[in-house]
Amino acid sequence: MYEYIRGQFQGISKDYVVIELNNIGYRIFTSGNTMSNMPKVGDEVLLYLEQIVREDFIGLYGFTTKEELEMFKLLLSINGVGAKAALSLLSISTVNNLKYAIMMGDEKHITRAPGIGKKTAQRIILELKDKLKPDELTSEEEQLIEGINDNSDYSFNINETLSALMALGYTEKEAQKALEKVDKTLSIENMIKESLKLLMR
């Protein structure tokens, strides 16, 4: 079992990041939230890990915060929710907003995640609502409750930008290389523009 990894950030793909440690590159699957918090290539980063072992697959899943890792584990505890679906849920909004959606029974917010239908959303709400206690939320988090859907798209930015660049004819490798040099806090439109400037040099 692994607790965390600390190493150099070396790249990003649609659903994973590459972290180099002792000259070994680790492919670590992660959410849009964690991707949006990645530093510049070559900078050090720490990810909290969960290893998933199946008969035909062994994978590492990592997150920049323990809170997101714990939410990932909670989602995996639900029947019918696998790692891919859990990452999808953690990519539609912040962990806090996802908590709010579950506690408030907001099926609409939860079904925004690709691959999550109404029945799965209902199961998530039913099984996790009581596990997410109000005392886990800070006063600052409570102030955000009215805007649960307002800013939940930002974690899609990286994946959407990569997809857009590839749709324009660039390879995944070319798109990734350009995106690594772009400010990830920008909007999708501006990330695409900045990436294109780099690609057209």
UniProtKB/Swiss-Prot annotation:
Keyword flag DNA damage: yes
Pfam families on file: HHH_5, RuvA_C, RuvA_N
UniProt subunit comment: Homotetramer. Forms an RuvA(8)-RuvB(12)-Holliday junction (HJ) complex. HJ DNA is sandwiched between 2 RuvA tetramers; dsDNA enters through RuvA and exits via RuvB. An RuvB hexamer assembles on each DNA strand where it exits the tetramer. Each RuvB hexamer is contacted by two RuvA subunits (via domain III) on 2 adjacent RuvB subunits; this complex drives branch migration. In the full resolvosome a probable DNA-RuvA(4)-RuvB(12)-RuvC(2) complex forms which resolves the HJ.
Recorded domain comment: Has three domains with a flexible linker between the domains II and III and assumes an 'L' shape. Domain III is highly mobile and contacts RuvB.
The protein's name: Holliday junction branch migration complex subunit RuvA
Any one annotated GO CC term: cytoplasm
Family to which the UniProt record says this protein belongs: Belongs to the RuvA family.
Renumbered residue ranges of the record's region Domain II: 65-143
CDD domains, A to Z: UBA_RuvA_C (cd14332)
Gene Ontology molecular function, alphabetical: ATP binding; four-way junction DNA binding; four-way junction helicase activity
Biological source species: Clostridium perfringens (strain SM101 / Type A)
Keywords annotated in UniProt: Cytoplasm, DNA damage, DNA recombination, DNA repair, DNA-binding
